[in-house]
Each structure stands twice: as C-alpha cells, then as structure tokens.
C-alpha cells in the first residue's frame, strides 16, 4: 500500500481565510474539531498534496505556506486528486474521499484575492471522517483504494422462453 506522510495539519476559525498550522488536530464525526468548515456535510476535512502546492508555486512564482489554500491536512506521497471515493487510514483514523475539487469562490478566497488563482478547485480533495482520532505532522496514512465489485448479467429472451439452455457464463454467487 502507498504511504502518505502528513506534512502539516491546519485550522481556521473563520471560512474564507487561510488556515494556520497547529501541532495536532482532532478528527471527529463532524470533521476537524475547532475548524470553521466542520459540520455534518460531505466536505468535513480538506486535504491537499505538497505535489500540487509545488506545481502551483512553480506556475505562480510564489512560495505557498502550508494551510494557505485552506487545507486541513497537507500531505506528501500520493497525488490525492486522482483517488475518488478511496480511503486513507492510520492511527485508528479513517477518512473517505467524498469530493475532488470545488467551486472557486473568487474574491471570497484569501489566496485567490492575493494571487488570482487557486489549486483547490482542481486538486484539493474533501473527505468525511469514518473513524476519528488525533493527527499531527510526521504521522502517516495508508492509501486504501476502494474495491468495486462488478457483476455482468446476460439476459436472453430465448433462453428464458425455454428454447435453449444459456451456457454463456457461470451464475453469480
């Protein structure tokens, strides 16, 4: 499994502002305890990969601090936006990706006001908390891809009518 290193954990008390790195965050059933975006919705926790931040820094020719894109968790090791519906687990914590990207708030976003662009609409991800716990910089999460079980059903009117026995494939168990 792929390991994801936590580079920073960040909180803001008000929406539309840059998040501030803190020593530890507590993930609970509504998201990050004490964060403005916590609540009973599908975007409880925001994550952004250092790889995405570095790409933005190169394009904007500006250094970006952790939390500046208002992400709760800054990670390294996996391009997060390529993993819809997957899970990240570690230290008893379990997060499930619920959304990739978001609508840009334009002037309602601190980084957009300053730079004129933002990475979150395309590469930021959002997750819900399945199992909570404490998380800090230096911790690791394990990437767990969602396994999709697929069954193919072949229907035959002639076999159903008893004209012949359909032997095309095994029965689904």
Each language-model region and where it sits:
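Glycine-rich phosphate/diphosphate-binding loop of Rossmann-like nucleotide-binding domains
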Residues: 148-173
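Metal-cofactor-dependent catalytic cores
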Residues: 1-148, 160
């Amino acid at each position: 499994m792929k390991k994801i290193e936590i580079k920073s954990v960040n909180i803001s008390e008000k929406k539309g502002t840059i998040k501030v790195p803190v020593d530890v965050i507590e993930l609970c059933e509504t998201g990050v305890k004490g964060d403005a975006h916590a609540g009973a919705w599908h975007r409880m926790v925001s994550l952004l990969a250092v790889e995405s931040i570095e790409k933005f820094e190169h394009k904007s020719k500006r250094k970006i601090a952790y939390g500046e894109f208002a992400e709760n968790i800054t990670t390294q090791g996996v391009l997060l936006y390529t993993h819809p519906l997957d899970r990240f687990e570690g230290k008893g914590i379990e997060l499930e990706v619920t959304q990739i990207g978001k609508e840009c708030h334009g002037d309602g976003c601190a980084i957009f006001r300053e730079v004129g662009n933002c990475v979150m609409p395309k590469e930021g991800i959002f997750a819900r908390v399945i199992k909570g716990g404490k998380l800090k910089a230096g911790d690791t999460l394990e990437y767990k891809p969602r396994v999709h079980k697929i069954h193919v059903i072949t229907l035959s009117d002639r076999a159903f009518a008893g004209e012949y026995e359909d032997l095309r494939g095994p029965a689904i168990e």
